[in-house]
Amino acid sequence: DLHMLEGLRDLLGEKFTQLVETYNSDCEQRLSNAGKAIAVREFSVINHEAHGVKGSSRNIGANGLAKLCGELESKAKAEDDANIEQLFSAIEQEFAAVKQKLNNLL
């Protein structure tokens, strides 16, 4: 939600940049870990990393990304790998869009 992000930026001032950098770095690492775990079907790792990105994304208002990560988390809990690569690809695309929006606010 762009309005929420603008509100956060106005509220946090200079600390908003640090928040964005931390979010981007954390999500990049978690998504990298999840991608590796998907390749070898380590469902507990997939679940953990998807949960982390979901929570961080909700906190900054990236609800679409949080929803996709929730779907991945559910698949991992059920050890359901049907279409998991396609879902992960959608997550990566959504994260790229979120990252671009955040960087545009800096």
Predicted regions and their residues:
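Two-component system phosphorelay core
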Residues: 1-106
